[in-house]
Amino acid sequence: MNPRRKKRLTLAVALIVGVSAIASLLLYALNSNLNLFFTPTEIIHGKKDTGVMPEVGQRIRVGGMVTIGSMVRDPESLHVEFAIHDISGGEIIVTYDDLLPDLFREGQGIVAQGVLSAPGVLQATEVLAKHDENYMPPEVAEAMGQTHEKLDYNQEQKSGGY
């Protein structure tokens, strides 16, 4: 092999190795920043279509309804624990160490983002409550089997009268 060909081959191999390394690092970074959405039932039994279950230590988003009577507050700190459930009956525990949103209450739809600290236990870093009594995050509405219903106004409401 002449020196010119050897130099080209070395350059081509170095270029392929460099592009492969960059692609690997990019995919690793994207995977570590990926937050998959799950319902409580999917956390317990896996997703219906793929059977994928979140692993302990994985960052995820969970949506469901706060179970009535499940909220436990620590009087000495901001720590709070509550359960969320979905229409399929799955229920998980969410722990949170910060102030809950003003609109948070039992029986309401929420989305919690955090790390799965144990099977069925989410250590939340963020809790989002719905905006009003008619709003539900799209992921939660889909998981709960609900669809958006358009509000019907009567003529008096449309004309501005109460």
Swiss-Prot record:
Alphabetic keyword roster: Cell inner membrane, Cell membrane, Cytochrome c-type biogenesis, Heme, Iron, Membrane, Metal-binding, Signal-anchor, Transmembrane, Transmembrane helix
MF GO annotations: heme binding; metal ion binding
Residues the record lists as binding heme: 131, 135
SUPFAM superfamilies: Heme chaperone CcmE
Top-level taxon of origin: Bacteria
Periplasmic side: 30-162
Pfam families named among the record's database cross-references: CcmE
GO cellular-component term (any): plasma membrane
InterPro entries linked to this entry: CcmE, CcmE-like_sf, NA-bd_OB-fold
Membrane association type: Single-pass type II membrane protein
Subcellular location: Cell inner membrane
Signal peptide segment: none
Cytoplasmic side: 1-8
One Gene Ontology term from the biological process aspect of the record: cytochrome complex assembly
Membrane-spanning segments: 9-29
Family as reported in the entry's similarity comment: Belongs to the CcmE/CycJ family.
Protein role: Heme chaperone required for the biogenesis of c-type cytochromes. Transiently binds heme delivered by CcmC and transfers the heme to apo-cytochromes in a process facilitated by CcmF and CcmH.
PANTHER family attached to this UniProt entry: CYTOCHROME C-TYPE BIOGENESIS PROTEIN CCME HOMOLOG, MITOCHONDRIAL (PTHR34128:SF2)
NCBIfam families: PRK13165.1, PRK13254.1-3
Protein name: Cytochrome c-type biogenesis protein CcmE
Taxonomic placement: Bacteria, Pseudomonadati, Pseudomonadota, Gammaproteobacteria, Alteromonadales
